[in-house]
C-alpha cells in the first residue's frame, strides 16, 4: 500500500532525518513512526486535573452519610471552637 503525503514540512523533515541518519526516506519515516507509536503506546493518557477532581467530587458526593453529627461534633470541638 502506498502512502502519499503532500506536505512541504513533512517532506523537509523526512529528508533531513534521512540525511542525518543515513537511512532511505522510507526507512526514516517508518522508524520515526515506529518510535512515536511506541512512545504513545507506553504513555498513559493524561487526564486534566479539573476532570480528575470533578470525578473525585462526584464519587464523594455519592457516598452515604454514616454519621449525622456536625464536623465540629465529630472532631470534639465545643461552641468556642476548642477541643472539648
Swiss-Prot record:
Domain of life of the source: Bacteria
Role of this protein: Antitoxin component of a type II toxin-antitoxin (TA) system. Upon expression in M.smegmatis neutralizes the effect of cognate toxin VapC30.
Name assigned to this protein: Antitoxin VapB30
Keyword line: Toxin-antitoxin system
Stored InterPro entries: VapB-like
GO terms of biological process kind: positive regulation of growth
Amino acid at each position: 500500500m502506498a502512502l502519499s503525503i503532500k506536505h512541504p514540512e513533512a517532506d523537509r523533515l523526512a529528508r533531513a532525518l534521512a540525511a542525518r541518519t543515513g537511512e532511505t526516506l522510507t526507512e526514516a519515516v517508518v522508524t520515526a513512526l515506529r518510535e512515536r507509536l511506541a512512545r504513545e503506546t507506553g504513555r498513559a493518557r493524561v487526564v486534566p486535573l479539573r476532570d480528575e477532581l470533578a470525578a473525585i467530587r462526584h464519587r464523594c458526593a455519592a457516598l452515604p452519610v454514616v454519621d449525622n453529627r456536625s464536623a465540629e461534633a465529630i472532631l470534639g470541638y465545643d461552641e468556642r471552637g476548642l477541643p472539648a
